[in-house]
Amino acid sequence: MYKLVLIRHGESTWNKENRFTGWVDVDLTEQGNLEAQQAGTLLKDSGYMFDIAYTSVLKRAIRTLWHVQDKMDLMYLPVVHSWRLNERHYGALSGLNKAETAARFGDEQVLVWRRSYDTPPPALEPTDSRTSYDDPRYAKVPREELPLTECLKDTVARVMPIWNESIAPAIKSGRKVLIAAHGNSIRALVKYLDNISDSDIVGLNIPNGVPLVYELDENLKPIKHYYLGDQEAIAKAQAAVAKQGKAG
């Protein structure tokens, strides 16, 4: 049996402000730093150990990983940074307040943009300052692969190459893997691992800063999965994530 641990970054400044973040590189709040530190302590106290970590190229996930490494005394851990683990790109919604957007377009439309599998938000114009074209962290990524918007289906397509080419082989080789990423890149992995339908994925909410453990068989098929920590608090956190896109 193999174990894989996934963790969504702690609360970010734009999580707190209820804004669509996507590829915008905002940092953690004080609460987000604390959530990441608590996750590291929980993993250490629960007896977890890791051989390699994967994260995105966005500082909220990277800093979350740093806190976990620090609390586990694993600062030496090899880390793979990949743009493929970035949050889903929210296109023209990037930076907008979720509740205000819902008040303007309606709860149902915003829920479709946020949570449906194959409907992306309106795309950025290629000349928009929010594009990633001139960002040095994407200098080696072909321009045509840099998104101007994404639905979850697009995010799955972006995430799967690093799973197939690097993460899955690492797990099968016996390495203990930790992934510190984002709500939708984790949803993409969970959809694949659990074979969740396109319609059911709409209801899946990933809380900030809570370790999600997968126990996998020899074919990397899930035996079971569970969150570490206070289950009542985790359920409340998931409900809060679900409520973010509503106007009320």
UniProtKB/Swiss-Prot annotation:
Homodimer. It is an enzyme of class 5 (isomerase). Gene3D superfamilies: Phosphoglycerate mutase-like. Coiled coil: none annotated. Keywords: Gluconeogenesis, Glycolysis, Isomerase. Pathway: Carbohydrate degradation; glycolysis; pyruvate from D-glyceraldehyde 3-phosphate: step 3/5. The keyword RNA-binding does not apply. One of its GO terms (biological process) is glycolytic process. It comes from Paraburkholderia phymatum (strain DSM 17167 / CIP 108236 / LMG 21445 / STM815) (Burkholderia phymatum). Catalyzes the interconversion of 2-phosphoglycerate and 3-phosphoglycerate. GO terms for molecular function: phosphoglycerate mutase activity. This is 2,3-bisphosphoglycerate-dependent phosphoglycerate mutase. The active site is at 9 (tele-phosphohistidine intermediate), 87 (proton donor/acceptor). The gene is gpmA.
